[in-house]
Amino acid sequence: MLEVIKAIEAEQVRNDLPEFHVGDTVKVHQKIKEGTRERVQIFEGTVLKRQNGGARETFTVRRVAYNVAVEKTFPVNSPLIEKIQVVRKGKVRRAKLYYLRDRVGKAAKVKERI
């Protein structure tokens, strides 16, 4: 039974997305359907965490706009994600960057990896 589940999950995993890590600044191009129209919405922010693995993998992106913090969680293998662009590579020592939620301004910056 386990082999069947792994085989199905292996078919659903996307290979066309770039490699990105926690701390990276990414642009997520997401398809949004409004009535009959379909458009692409871009959400740019810092990757706070990556969870699970395989077909069920998700990642959370945080961005602060007009002094309001917004966090969105995306499934990596979702067909609604058109593409992911890595804008900046971040250098962090943690797998989950929850401490950034308490930081404001320059204190919430992540060092750049060269």
Curated annotation (Swiss-Prot):
The keyword Protein biosynthesis does not apply. Keywords: Ribonucleoprotein, Ribosomal protein. It holds the Pfam family Ribosomal_L19. It comes from the Bacteria. PROSITE patterns: RIBOSOMAL_L19. One of its GO terms (biological process) is translation. InterPro entries: Ribosomal_bL19, Ribosomal_bL19_CS, Ribosomal_bL19_sf, Translation_prot_SH3-like_sf. GO terms for cellular component: cytosolic large ribosomal subunit. GO terms for molecular function: structural constituent of ribosome. This protein is located at the 30S-50S ribosomal subunit interface and may play a role in the structure and function of the aminoacyl-tRNA binding site. Belongs to the bacterial ribosomal protein bL19 family. This is Large ribosomal subunit protein bL19. It comes from Clostridium botulinum (strain Loch Maree / Type A3). The gene is rplS.
